[in-house]
Amino acid sequence: MRYPNLKKYGFSERFELEASFYEGLYPARVTEQHRNIYRVICEDGELQAEVSGKLQYAAECTMDFPAVGDWVMIDRIDGNSGSVMIRSILRRKSFFARRAAGGKEDVQIVAANVDTIFICMSLNTDFNLRRLERYMSIAWDSMATPVIVLTKSDLCDDIEDKIREVSSVSAGADIMICSNAEERGIDAVYRYIEEGKTIAFIGASGVGKSTLINRLMGREVLATKEIRESDDRERHATRHTASCFYCLRAEWSSIRPG
C-alpha cells in the first residue's frame, strides 16, 4: 500500500484505487468540521483544510460538501502555507444524514464511511421502542451495520422483558447490555473495534454515550456531567460528537484486550 499510515484510518484498497486517478493530489480523511474549516488526517499528520472554490461552485446541495469521515483529495500534505485545499471527495461507501437546520429540504451528512453504528438506549427512563425503530431505520439506510447497546442495566429491574421488546424490533441486529456504573458488558463492545474500521454512536441525550466511549478509551476523552438524582439521566455534555469518533478510532484499535 502506498499510504501505510492511512490504513489504520480505514483507507482500504477501494479508496486507494479511486485516489490513484487524481494526479498531483493526496488522500486525507476528514476528522472534524467547524463551519467552513475542516481538520483532515493525511499520511504525514493532521492539517487544517478548506474546500476549494471549484468544489464549492460545483456543489448543488450540502451533500456535495465534505463531511466528517469523508475521504478527500487535498492539494498538498504540509501546513506551512495556511490551510490545504480539498479538491475532491471520494465516493462514500456509507453515510448517515439528517435534515438541514432551519426547516430546509436539504439533507446534511452527519458522518460518512462508517462501518458500525452503535445505537445507544438506556434501560431506565429513556427506554423508547419507537425512537429505537427510527434510529434503526437511519442505520440501515446509511449502509452501516447497526448494533443496539442497552445502557444503564444497573437501573433496570426487568431486563429480560426489555430485551424481548427490543428483539421484536431489532431486525436481527446484535443486542448488547451495558452498565457504565458497573463496567458490565464493556468487553463485548471491543469485538467490533479493529484497525481500519470506523464506528459511531447515536442515541438520545443522557443515555451514556460519552461515558461508554471514555470506558473504552480507559481515560476521559469526552466530557460528561453529573447524574441528576431526579431521573437518573446524565446531563448532556458531548459536543462535536461525530467528529470525535474518527479521531479516537485509531487509538481504540490499540487498546483491545489481549
Task: Map each language-model feature to its residues.
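General small-molecule cofactor/ligand-binding pocket signal
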Residues: 87, 176, 255
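Switch I (effector-binding) loop of TRAFAC-class P-loop GTPase G-domains
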Residues: 219-253
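Walker A/P-loop
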Residues: 210-211, 215
